[in-house]
Amino acid sequence: LEKVSDAALSTATGAGASHVDVRIERTRTGLLSLRDAKPETQSDETNFGIGVRVIVNGAWGFASSPDVSVETAQKLALTAVAMAKTSKPLSTDEISLVPEPVYAKKSWVSAYEIDPFSVTDADKKDRLASLSSKLLAAKGVNHTSAHTMYVKEQKHYADSAGTSTTQQRVRVQTQIEAISTGDHGFESMRTLAQPAGYGWEWMGNSIWNWDAEIEQLPTLLAEKVAAP
């Protein structure tokens, strides 16, 4: 990645940019949903791209592409410079950046124990199915819906001041819903766990007690159904 960002930096500065920054990002997103404890939808997709931003004569210029290569980085740098020159007559204020500390060759990884993408699809399905089945076995619960989304973001940043960083973070979001249908119509009650900056360990009970919350949902749902 450094070869790609270096190509953009050198090309843009050579074309007259007073400031250049490059961002290369890969985002992998997995999604799994179950209906009544049975698999309904599953996807695993990756987005990859590069963005080049420049300042030329006090004006911003920007260009991006899903193709990450040295050749593309050079083309984007020239496009960004051309855009800055084009937008200069329309700029009402001259851009001036505040000096920032330089972080050369630094890296950061968010704290997590289990990469969700290292967990087998079967294990993920089993966990959601187990929680869903507990709800389905409860009185008054006719259907369940469960879904989890897990994301891994990897970013590389470099600028003409000398900063070059990489970072990786993982997050998981899961929601399980109990549904009641009948003469009363349709009512539902879901888990309250928020999106979290954890790995798949989030789906155990050590951080958020999923099993305990699942045990409470049927009672809460029944109270909601009975409410006037």
Give each language-model segment a name.
Residues 1-228:
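Active-site bordering "gate/hinge" segments
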